[in-house]
A protein has these predicted regions:
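Active-site glycine/GP-rich loop and adjacent strand/helix microenvironment
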Residues: 1-176
Length: 176
């Protein structure tokens, strides 16, 4: 079918380059990534440009840093570590060195699009055990709490899969 869409901006959940290609092919659009956090302002913290080699951080509003997740030591540009933001224009609920738990890399290399804003990579993982399933933050400890409350033994297995581009989470419990 023909549609008038030319561009799609996607965020809220990590997606792969394979998923980008599938979205672009199936919808006939150019797909761009956007990064945000509920704790900051939602979407709009960083955005992908036409070069699509990382996301430019909106440095008019945020100071990004990469730290060692274990020591809190600030790491140089190009090093992989935990992404931290300080908000500089948010007045009602400012954030100082907010630990996102997302593992990323920051780069000040010149972008072919001409922008000079620092770029962040797509998150490559997390520094905690949080899972993001269909846009919902899930901690294994939350699952364990529910299982124990319902009288199940603490022996369980969490299986995460992707079926037709939809995350699934199954919990297998050992019955006693």
């Amino acid at each position: 079918e023909d549609n008038d869409l030319r561009i799609g901006i996607f965020g809220a959940e990590p997606w792969t380059e394979e998923m980008r290609r599938e979205i672009e092919a199936s919808l006939g659009i150019k797909a761009y990534d956007i990064y945000g956090l509920t704790e900051t302002t939602g979407p709009g913290v960083a955005f992908e440009c036409c070069a699509q080699h990382g996301m430019h951080v909106n440095e008019d509003h945020f100071i990004p840093e990469i730290i060692d997740p274990d020591t809190g030591e600030v790491l140089p540009d190009g090093e992989k570590g935990e992404l931290v933001f300080t908000s500089i224009t948010k007045e009602a609920f400012p954030l100082l060195r907010y630990r996102t738990r997302d593992i990323c890399v920051l780069s000040r290399e010149k972008c072919s699009c001409g922008r000079t804003l620092i770029k962040m990579s797509k998150p490559m993982g997390r520094s905690d055990d949080m899972l993001i399933i269909r846009g919902v933050n899930v901690f294994p400890s939350q699952i364990e709490t529910v299982l124990l409350k319902e009288g199940y033994a603490p022996n369980y297995q969490i299986e995460i899969d992707r079926v037709r581009n939809t995350d699934t989470l199954d919990v297998y419990v050992e019955l006693t």
